[in-house]
Amino acid sequence: LGPFGPRFTAAKLLAEALPALSNAERRRRSIELLESVGLGEAHLSRKPVTLSGGQRQRVAIARALAAEPEVLVCDEAVSALDVTVQAQVLDLLEHLRVTTGVAMIFISHDIGVVQHIADRVLVMKDGRVVESGDVDAVLGSPTHPYTRALLAAVPTIPGETLASTAPVVSDAGRN
């Protein structure tokens, strides 16, 4: 359940992020936020324990968007989700990036996810950047031994490349 208290509804979680608004404005804005992440008004009354992992992640994204940030930090935002839900959340984040203009810093240990979502990549080892650049350049022709070791550690099916094992983006129904 992460940062969500089990007693709070999605409405309460979103309302906490909108303290300057009246109750009516908070409700209206909460519905807008939920709709922006593929959920709806019916989810306002739901508690985290009744939501799927993907739905909880969408509520968390809606809550973060309530502040209308210029930059959204996504720290392992899809690591606890199954692959199909990962693809849906990644699609959602890409859609939000395009429609709202929010920049994203996406932190992940999953090379396939990084390859799918990122334009640029920083590879860190022991808290220091060891390689950075265009994601295709860094992952396609790594220059640092640590980056090469990370890429070599990615499990693959014989005959498949890293690109072919990245999450599949689909138009499947939202979770």
Positions of PLM-derived features:
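Conserved ABC ATPase "signature" region
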Residues: E25-A42, L151-A152
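A short, surface-exposed alpha-helical micro-motif characterized by mixed small hydrophobic
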Residues: V114-H116
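Conserved catalytic motifs of ABC-family nucleotide-binding domains
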Residues: E68
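Conserved ABC ATPase signature
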Residues: K47-L51, Q55
